[in-house]
């Protein structure tokens, strides 16, 4: 099945005279192939923090050997409950650096019954923010009082505010933003919440739980997705170079990537190499997952510029550009929107902002 998908992609590349198969998938949003290649190549140079994280986990968990599935084990037990009203207060306090206007919009969104909050019988799982132009966004939650659900609320509110700013400033025809920028606002808000809770908590166990949650987020949303993006690229290269496509050759690509990313820190279990066969995006939405990583990298750089910057005037300018990004909807190609906000995804430094973030979290 996957071979037929690869063959179709390369056939379409030839029929439409694309220079490379990447152009087939990236041209819709006018994304240069250099962005994709810069992402996968730079991250392979920045795996040291990832290996450091595994070594720390291995030491704390007192394991002689570390397997991929050990990543699901929490470093500590933390079962504190966060009532919904408390979660709202935490988030509203955390986003104050974005200004009074942003804070007022979020407070309004939380007070007008736009959110279906709690789990109920027959309700679908997950969380989602859906915009309705000329009305307002609606939010689906399944809030269960866990720390994770607090961050999910912050995440979805990021989407909701992005939608509000876009719809308030753009006509209907240009109000929808692309997937390429969609996760910037959501992960930005998660970072604000993390830093606020780390600064205000007096509970050492909560502090560890916060750090562990965010580190897992960096690994899962950035490193893992770039590994998968690299896999897709190499799998397509097999067909482009007229090499044999078999389960073994596909599994060897995955094995080599895990070796590159994790080195000797993780045991190479046999099933690890066939993980490609259960990633639905590979089959249903080729060259989609890299966008999770580009959004995460963009968000990390914007956060450093707009929130952490030491120069007041530059920080204020970066914050203004960030709000303009949220307000831009689909009025331009996403690369142009991000560049106006100060993000150059063709630069290695933009990608390295995430590895620096992971190192900083590990230091804490």
Protein language model annotation of sequence segments:
Residues 1-138:
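Contiguous, non-catalytic segments that form substrate-binding/exosite surfaces or channel walls
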Residues 16-23, 65-67, 125-136, 156-167, ...:
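Active-site-adjacent bridging/hinge elements
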Residues 177-206, 214-216, 220, 295:
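Post-HExxH zinc-binding segment in Zn-dependent metallohydrolases
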Residues 12, 59, 63-69, 153, ...:
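C-terminal, non-catalytic "cap/extension" segments appended to globular domains
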Residues 17, 144-164, 186, 191, ...:
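Active-site recognition of the HExxH zinc-binding catalytic motif
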Residues 39-47, 88, 215, 250-258, ...:
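Short amphipathic alpha-helical coiled-coil/interface segments
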Residues 24-37, 69-80, 100, 134-147, ...:
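Glycine- and acidic
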Residues 93, 97-104, 130, 159, ...:
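Conserved helix-loop functional segments at active or binding sites
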């Amino acid at each position: 099945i996957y071979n037929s998908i690869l063959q179709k992609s390369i056939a379409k590349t030839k029929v439409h005279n694309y220079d490379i198969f990447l152009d087939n998938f990236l041209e819709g949003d006018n994304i240069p192939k250099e962005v994709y290649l810069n992402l996968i190549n730079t991250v392979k140079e920045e795996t040291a923090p990832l290996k450091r994280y595994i070594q720390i986990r291995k030491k704390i968990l007192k394991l002689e050997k570390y397997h991929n599935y050990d990543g699901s084990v929490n470093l500590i037990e933390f079962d504190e409950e966060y009532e919904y009203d408390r979660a709202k207060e935490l988030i509203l306090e955390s986003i104050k650096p974005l200004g009074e206007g942003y804070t007022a919009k979020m407070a309004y969104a939380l007070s007008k019954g736009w959110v279906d909050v709690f789990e109920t019988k027959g309700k679908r799982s997950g969380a989602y923010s859906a915009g309705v132009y000329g009305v307002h966004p609606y939010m689906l939650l399944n809030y269960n009082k866990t720390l994770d659900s607090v961050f999910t609320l912050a995440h979805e509110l990021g989407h909701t505010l992005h939608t509000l700013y876009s719809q308030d400033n753009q006509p209907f025809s240009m109000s929808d933003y692309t997937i390429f920028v969609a996760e910037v606002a959501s992960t930005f808000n998660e970072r604000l919440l993390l830093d606020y809770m780390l600064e205000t908590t007096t509970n050492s166990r909560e502090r560890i739980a916060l750090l562990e949650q965010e580190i897992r987020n960096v690994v899962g949303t950035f490193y893992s997705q770039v590994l998968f993006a690299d896999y897709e690229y190499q799998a397509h290269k097999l067909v482009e170079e007229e090499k044999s496509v078999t389960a073994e050759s596909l599994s060897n690509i995955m094995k080599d990537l895990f070796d590159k990313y994790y080195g000797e820190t993780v045991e190479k279990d046999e099933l690890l190499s066939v993980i490609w066969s259960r990633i639905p995006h590979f089959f249903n939405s080729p060259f989609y997952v890299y966008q999770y990583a580009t959004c995460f990298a963009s968000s990390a750089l914007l956060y450093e510029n707009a929130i952490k910057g030491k120069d007041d005037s530059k920080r204020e300018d970066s914050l203004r550009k960030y709000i303009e990004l949220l307000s831009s909807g689909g009025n331009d190609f996403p690369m142009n929107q991000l560049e106006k906000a100060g993000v150059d995804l063709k630069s290695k430094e933009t990608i390295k902002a995430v590895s620096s973030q992971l190192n900083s979290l590990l230091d804490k």
